[in-house]
Amino acid sequence: MKIIPYRKRSVLIATIFAISAVGITGCSDNTETKAVERVEEAAALARVKDLEARAEALKSNMPAANDMTATAGGTDTASGKPTIKMPDESTIPDDEFGAAVRRGLQISNHTYKELPNNVGNQLNCTSCHLGNGSEAYAAPWNNTPSVYPNYSKRTGRINTIQERINGCFERSLNGKALDLNSDDMNAMVSYMSWLSQDMPFGVSPEGSGFVKVDKTLEPNTDNGKKLFAEKCSVCHGATGEGQYNDDGTYVYPAIAGDKSFNDGAGMARTYTAASFIKGKMPFGQGGSLSDQEAVDIASYFTHLPRPIKANKDKDWPNGDAPKDVRR
């Protein structure tokens, strides 16, 4: 079913209004007005019928309020929401904006190599934002530009998209913020905008964020340690140190230790990490763990030694911090 352009919606509204107006005029009781001649009545009735037919034709092509099937990025038929999709790289324009998009993609996939002065570990943006930042249920960036500026409970104020990106640099990348007006910051925002080209403004695509887990579950860290050894250590190492090539690039990223994110990162929170694990881990086997197993594993590895985020006491200034926030 196709989305009707705004102008057609306006025509429909005007048509319905016209029908109502004709009906009201025909029913008005004005003793000073002579009765409408039969021929005029017939003409008025014909106009009403014509308007009704046009209105029905428009309504038959108009989707329900949540029907987004005309989205170019694809649609999840169950939810009616647009789906996450990496646009074809051939659509990147051959101009200054396109150059910024390509730079943003390069930074996203090779962050600590491209920006060594801003990254304090050996991770990339796409260590968590999988698939070039465009994989469903791996915190994809598709449509991210349309939700910022936005209120952040963690900072207690409105944040711009640039400030949100810098939050990741200071926490997930254990590094330093980019200059808000730098070419590299603009490149990252440009890349996110390009990713979002097929997304309707203000609509959360199917696959945004992470999968949901039951946050009422109490973690069993001992079981998490056992499961980590069985299901996670083969890639991430016995202590979460990851596997790295001689040139410093990783085969599997560190999820603990100095090469990993600090304790102020979202991924250092038990239930946030559990949501990522449930949807995407073990690698290639996402969805194979129960909520309880994901929570147990997350509780174990998020509390392994890792860098300490300075000034965490200033987070959540209004006292509404989730229970898994590190202090």
Curated annotation (Swiss-Prot):
PTM characteristics: Binds 2 heme c groups covalently per subunit.
Phenotype on disruption: Cells are unable to produce tetrathionate from thiosulfate.
Subcellular location: Periplasm
A GO cellular-component term linked to this record: periplasmic space
Alphabetically ordered keywords of this record: Heme, Iron, Metal-binding, Oxidoreductase, Periplasm, Repeat, Signal
Residues covered by the Cytochrome c domain: 99-196, 219-305
Chain positions recorded as heme c 2 binding sites: 232, 235-236
EC number(s) on file: 1.8.2.2
Record region (Disordered): 66-93
Primary location group: periplasm
GO MF entries: electron transfer activity; heme binding; metal ion binding; thiosulfate dehydrogenase activity
Annotated Low complexity bias: 66-78
Temperature dependence: Optimum temperature is 20 degrees Celsius.
InterPro entries according to UniProt: Cyt_c-like_dom (IPR009056), Cyt_c-like_dom_sf (IPR036909), Cytochrome_c-type_DH (IPR051459)
Signal peptide range: 1-26
Binding site for heme c 1: 125, 128-129
Catalytic activity: 2 thiosulfate + 2 Fe(III)-[cytochrome c] = tetrathionate + 2 Fe(II)-[cytochrome c] + 2 H(+)
Assembly and interaction partners: Monomer.
Annotated function: Catalyzes the oxidation of 2 molecules of thiosulfate to tetrathionate.
Name the UniProt record assigns to this protein: Thiosulfate dehydrogenase
